[in-house]
Amino acid sequence: MRSGDFDNAVIVLQRAIQKDPSNLELMKDLTMSLYLKRDYQKALDVAEKLTDRDDADEVCFQMAGNVYKALEQPKECDKLYKKALKKFPKSGPLYSEYGELLWSTKDYAAIDKWEKGIEVDPAYGGNYYNAALYYFFVKDKVWSLIYGEIFVNMESLSERGAAMKQLLLQGYKEKLFADVDLMQGQEKNKSEFARTFLETMNRQASLANQGLTTEVLTMIRTRFILEWYNQSAAKFPFKLFDFQQQLLKAGMFNAYNQWLFGPNENLAAYENWTKTHAEEYKNFENFQKSRVFKMPAGQYYQVR
């Protein structure tokens, strides 16, 4: 299967299954091979048998979902995800893919699935990605930034991570600091965390009066973290802000903000900064490669 010869892979797997018909992994491999060779109907036949098994795992349901999507059978796919989440109620990947199905049919309930995925499986990145994209395209100006930055740190080297960095810069420019008063229109915001975030950012907003460059964003975010840990951190422990404070104490917050915003804000200025601060940037890069960023349980503050 790894060589891309799916026809032969199917033959080999079918023969292996005849000898060992109860082997779950062989059936999963057969489903994937049929899916990759675009024989979706046969893939569905195997996938349905898989998901009916008592020992079916999350991947079985994910595969079946992909086959239903390929066959453009959203109603059957919807039933499948409901069945899957009854069996695996804390599966981030299943919530993420269920939300993607709903979004593809223009059903805005997709965000409820992504939020639930973040709440029950905070270490999985896909729901942050989908939720951040959703919030970038609605009026929200908090969770697009929070979830977007969490995702960028979870997938710091991926293409999706690079695209999210561009959206983050746009979010700060076009959403968070679009109004002089950041609290405008936030009277009905149910999340105390979100209101506190905006109130704290609002007190730094005057720094944006001359425009938002990477340097200005670094100043704003530095002041935000200092004030947050003076006033709000005890009430709202949050791994993303802990990480920012860690970078600040280690003298790497400037480099982090350059990495986060610089290439999209002003590529020439970013490249010049990395050359004139070569050691500082190298230290940050080495630190970044040495750690894995994950959100812990118990830090979910969204209220819908």
Task: Specify the residue positions occupied by each region the protein language model found.
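Register position in tetratricopeptide repeats
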Residues: R2-S3, L36-K37, A70-L71, W103-T105, ...
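Canonical positions in the second alpha-helix
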Residues: R15-A16, K49-L50, K83-A84, K116-G117, ...
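Short coil turns that delineate tetratricopeptide repeat
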Residues: P21, D55, P89, P122, ...
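TPR alpha-solenoid repeat register
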Residues: L26, C60, L94, N127, ...
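Canonical tetratricopeptide repeat
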Residues: D29-M32, Q62-M63, E97, N130, ...
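Eukaryotic alpha-helical solenoid repeat scaffolds
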Residues: A123-R304
